């Protein structure tokens, strides 16, 4: 597939802007950056150039407005829609662009969870066969995952050509997933994040948000703690993802997608996270120019200084991780019977199980969950967690011994863990000594 010209609709948004940079740099494509007004488009052009750290691509990025749709789409090999996650807004955009789409043009949507089948039905049948989900992760320059989702109408040849282009030209780690709510990466990732948020409420008298983040932080195989991640993404986006999953699925983890009331109250107060300056955490600029971090106290409903919790198992794990004694680090966790260590190991077990269940349900193969979590979230992949605990049999024994009776009643542990391969990923690169 030879894609020389691309139109990005909604190019002023974070993802639309960053993806413009990917097409212009890796793809060396002419990219029409369509925004509602020229001022927004010109600002987006500058940001896109900065996002890939390559000023030379500026010549490939062309600011445009909706008044230029006929010119842009008529000349494009691929049209990428990246407007807000609102089905009515997307429908309105599709109505505007449909009349200009050429017979050869690929149409992609960057939706992070809306149904590809539902969206495709806003187009005529001859256009639907070229329509698919192309979901990249932010920032795409660093996170190479691209979830590709066909609809029931997508032409297989077009699908395969687009996947090859994404792999070979844009250097994406492409995972084809079924048209299920939140697809795969966000389904697995936000199950973990939202349950961590529920645990923050459950353990609010112990400290709540920063207490839980201290228990399942970077030393457990993720680039940042889960509730820091929620703040980074935005509580409003977090809520949209989990609400969609809760409404449209009914697996054993269904109730873990209910957002706690305190977080809904923060959203109502426009305390959405990093983008508004306060959410679960709050950044304070001190008079000397330095920054300090406060955290939302669920009990008092005010912000307080972030605590520096000292849990023996965490200190021991980090000490072992620093010198590369991974087996010893996980033995320290497994042999510690404190409340905090139990929470930590149970979260890791549940993450593995949900990842495997999800990849069997909606992935291409058993390694799909590993691919999406490693390259979309920079989290240790589920199968790699099993390797870190000493292999399948060792993990099975630990999982049965450490899981709650309630959790074990929901699942068939032995069946889920049956005949699993080793991960393609080296777990050692994900566990941070901090």
Where are the model-predicted features located?
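N-terminal glycine-rich phosphate-binding loop for ADP-containing cofactors
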Residues: 1-434
């Amino acid at each position: 597939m030879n894609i020389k010209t691309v139109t990005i609709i909604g190019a002023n948004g974070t993802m639309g802007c960053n993806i413009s940079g990917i097409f212009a740099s890796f793809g060396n494509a002419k990219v029409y950056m369509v925004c509602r007004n020229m001022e927004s488009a010109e600002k987006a052009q500058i940001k896109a150039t900065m996002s890939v750290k390559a000023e030379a691509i500026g010549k490939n990025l062309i600011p445009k407005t909706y008044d230029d749709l006929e010119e842009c789409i008529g000349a494009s090999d691929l049209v990428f829609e990246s407007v807000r996650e609102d089905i009515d807004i997307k429908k309105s955009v599709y109505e505007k662009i449909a009349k200009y789409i050429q017979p050869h043009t690929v149409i992609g949507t960057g939706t992070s969870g809306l149904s590809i089948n539902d969206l495709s039905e806003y187009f005529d049948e001859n256009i639907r066969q070229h329509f698919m989900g192309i979901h990249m992760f932010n920032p795409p320059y660093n996170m190479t995952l691209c979830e590709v989702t066909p609809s029931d109408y997508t032409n297989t040849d077009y699908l395969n050509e687009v996947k090859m282009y994404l792999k070979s030209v844009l250097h994406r780690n492409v995972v084809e997933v079924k048209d299920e709510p939140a697809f795969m990466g966000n389904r697995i990732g936000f199950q973990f994040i939202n349950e961590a948020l529920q645990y923050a409420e459950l353990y609010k008298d112990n400290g709540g948000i920063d207490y839980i983040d201290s228990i399942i932080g970077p030393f457990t195989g993720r680039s940042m703690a889960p509730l820091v991640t929620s703040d980074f993404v935005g509580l409003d986006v977090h809520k949209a993802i989990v609400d969609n999953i809760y409404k449209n699925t009914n697996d054993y983890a269904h109730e873990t997608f209910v957002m706690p009331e305190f977080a809904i109250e923060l959203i109502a107060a426009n305390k959405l996270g990093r983008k508004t300056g306060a959410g679960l955490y709050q950044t304070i600029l001190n008079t000397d120019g330095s920054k300090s971090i406060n955290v939302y106290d669920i009990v008092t409903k005010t912000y307080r200084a972030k605590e520096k919790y000292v849990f023996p198992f965490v200190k021991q794990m980090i000490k072992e991780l620093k010198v590369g004694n991974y087996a010893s680090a996980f033995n320290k966790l497994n042999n510690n019977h404190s409340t905090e260590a139990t929470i930590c190991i149970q979260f890791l077990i549940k993450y593995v199980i949900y990842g495997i269940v999800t990849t069997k349900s909606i992935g291409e193969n058993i390694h799909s969950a590993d691919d999406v979590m490693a390259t979309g979230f920079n989290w240790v992949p589920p199968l790699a967690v099993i390797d870190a605990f000493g292999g399948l049999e060792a993990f099975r024994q630990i999982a049965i011994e450490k899981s709650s009776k309630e959790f074990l009643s929901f699942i068939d542990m032995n069946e889920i863990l049956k005949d699993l391969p080793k991960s393609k990923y080296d777990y050692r690169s994900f566990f941070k000594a901090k």
